[in-house]
Amino acid sequence: MKFLSARDFQPVAFLGLMLLTATAFPTSQVRRGDFTEDTTHNRPVYTTSQVGGLITYVLREILEMRKELCNGNSDCMNSDDALSENNLKLPEIQRNDGCFQTGYNQEICLLKICSGLLEFRFYLEFVKNNLQDNKKDKARVIQSNTETLVHIFKQEIKDSYKIVLPTPTSNALLMEKLESQKEWLRTKTIQLILKALEEFLKVTMRSTRQT
């Protein structure tokens, strides 16, 4: 990955990444091609291993929140009821997005990852707004570190103008629809959003190992 400086990150997200840096693999164990050196600035480097560590950290936070919301009930965690109730089309990485071993294309894959994570930004805001106060901090951590991942991956995209950005109008209409749900359905929707983000990040992590 490219060199990134401390000022590029939100405080919480940067702290998480710095903690990962302390336990990252030694440079001698990093594969050739894991990052591009920028000799014009004396900035810290974040390798594929470290980015994978950040994704793992976010996945752990998501799983913990899902377990809390479902009280550890496996049926609750695996339910997709809210998907059919709302006709939600949450971001997902498909075979033709260039992120899988067969047909891998780094540029196309990174565009999909960034576009998808930016779309999740809206859904994570809904999640945070509808959680109890004692769970909002964890939601903010997930939000902040997801933003960090967007920033990191965006630096690797040649044509960043091709990133698909959600429109404010469509977001506003969808937010109104989601907020109008009954409380029990809002809770299921939160669970579904977290589950979808979890799967999205798992595919993202596997794709980072392709390079």
Swiss-Prot record:
Keyword tags: Acute phase, Cytokine, Disulfide bond, Growth factor, Phosphoprotein, Secreted, Signal
Compartments where located: Secreted
Signal peptide: 1-24
InterPro entries documented for this protein: 4_helix_cytokine-like_core, IL-6-like, IL-6/GCSF/MGF, IL6/GCSF/MGF_CS
Domain of life assignment: Eukaryota
UniProt xrefs under Pfam families: IL6
One GO BP: positive regulation of estradiol secretion
SUPFAM superfamilies: 4-helical cytokines
One GO cellular component term: extracellular space
Cystine crosslinks: 70-76, 99-109
Up-regulation conditions: In pancreatic islets, secretion is stimulated by IL1B. In islets from Zucker diabetic fatty (ZDF) rats, but not lean animals, secretion is also increased by endocannabinoid anandamide/AEA.
List of residues that carry Phosphoserine: 79
Primary localization: secreted
Molecular-function annotations in GO: cytokine activity; growth factor activity; identical protein binding; interleukin-6 receptor binding; signaling receptor binding
Family: Belongs to the IL-6 superfamily.
Subunit composition and interactions: Component of a hexamer of two molecules each of IL6, IL6R and IL6ST; first binds to IL6R to associate with the signaling subunit IL6ST. Interacts with IL6R (via the N-terminal ectodomain); this interaction may be affected by IL6R-binding with SORL1, hence decreasing IL6 cis signaling. Interacts with SORL1 (via the N-terminal ectodomain); this interaction leads to IL6 internalization and lysosomal degradation. May form a trimeric complex with the soluble SORL1 ectodomain and soluble IL6R receptor; this interaction might stabilize circulating IL6, hence promoting IL6 trans signaling.
Purpose of the protein: Cytokine with a wide variety of biological functions in immunity, tissue regeneration, and metabolism. Binds to IL6R, then the complex associates to the signaling subunit IL6ST/gp130 to trigger the intracellular IL6-signaling pathway. The interaction with the membrane-bound IL6R and IL6ST stimulates 'classic signaling', whereas the binding of IL6 and soluble IL6R to IL6ST stimulates 'trans-signaling'. Alternatively, 'cluster signaling' occurs when membrane-bound IL6:IL6R complexes on transmitter cells activate IL6ST receptors on neighboring receiver cells. IL6 is a potent inducer of the acute phase response. Rapid production of IL6 contributes to host defense during infection and tissue injury, but excessive IL6 synthesis is involved in disease pathology. In the innate immune response, is synthesized by myeloid cells, such as macrophages and dendritic cells, upon recognition of pathogens through toll-like receptors (TLRs) at the site of infection or tissue injury. In the adaptive immune response, is required for the differentiation of B-cells into immunoglolin-secreting cells. Plays a major role in the differentiation of CD4(+) T cell subsets.
Designated name of the protein: Interleukin-6
Organism: Rattus norvegicus (Rat)
Name of the encoding gene: Il6
